[in-house]
Swiss-Prot record:
Name of the protein described by the UniProt record: Small ribosomal subunit protein uS2
BP terms from Gene Ontology: translation
Name of the coding gene: rpsB
Domain of life: Bacteria
Source species of the chain: Wigglesworthia glossinidia brevipalpis
Electron transport listed as a keyword: no
Length: 240
């Protein structure tokens, strides 16, 4: 059962779409009305589609699937990181590097380099270098951590991605579709829902709305893992 109400969504401004002149006609089925030249999203549909999406994410989580949270714009960045960490999943919140999914072999080499530099910074190697060389390596480490820190322990491609703002994250969506990775996304009235497997119509600009989505997703994933562990414990006890 989805721990989210219509009241929660209204208070967070989930229903506010973009100005009508910026709309994508493919979002018409999810629009309730126009008000002051702004499209109002049909929250009854949002609630239903959110529940469908969370049920599917729960299934992926229960089988220990890897879920990648993606949101690189300023309004989403910090919440993306915190939500992924909260449910022990993965994230990209700084900048999407082209080929992060479709060129995983190269990304894996960069992750290897990141881990080497992390190790060197902790074991005293940096202190043995010249100031200039230590500075260069520190900058490289910080750059790699910003870009790859959220996926350095992913160990392979994700089983699903959850995206805030499909218009802003077009490259990651294109890559996921190319590889057949299921996409769960918040889709605003200015975006095209056609390439998204699990559409959740909603405001993708409001910080309060973004926080609400991510808290719901994170807790859903976290709770599904807890319930799965409890089921497994009962099976073990029963067999013994």
């Amino acid at each position: 059962m989805l721990n989210l109400s219509m009241k929660d969504m209204i208070q967070s401004g989930v229903h506010f779409g973009h100005q009508t002149r910026y709309w994508n006609p493919n979002m018409k089925p999810f629009i309730f009305c126009k008000k002051n030249k702004v499209h109002i999203i049909n929250l009854e549909k949002t609630l239903i589609m959110f529940e469908i999406a969370m049920n599917e994410l729960s299934k992926i989580s229960k089988r220990d699937g890897k879920i990648l949270f993606i949101g690189t714009k300023r309004a989403a960045s910090e919440a993306i990181k915190n939500s992924a960490i909260n449910c022990n999943q993965f994230f990209v919140n700084y900048r999407w590097l082209g080929g992060m999914l479709t060129n995983w072999k190269t990304v894996r080499q960069s992750i290897k380099r990141l881990k080497e530099l992390e190790s060197q910074s902790k074991d005293g190697t940096f202190k043995k270098l010249t100031k200039k060389e230590a500075l260069i390596r520190t900058r490289t480490l910080n750059k790699l951590e910003n870009s790859l820190g959220g996926i350095k322990n992913m160990g392979g491609l994700p089983d699903a991605i959850f995206v805030i703002d499909v218009e802003h994250e077009k490259t990651s969506i294109k890559e996921a579709n190319k590889l057949g990775i299921p996409i769960f996304a918040i889709v605003d009235t200015n975006s095209n829902p056609k390439d998204i497997k699990f559409v959740i119509p909603g405001n993708d600009d409001s910080i309060r709305a973004i926080d609400l989505y991510l808290k719901t997703v994170s807790e859903t994933i976290k709770n599904s893992k807890i319930s799965n562990k409890e089921i497994n414990k009962k099976i073990i006890i029963k067999n013994n």
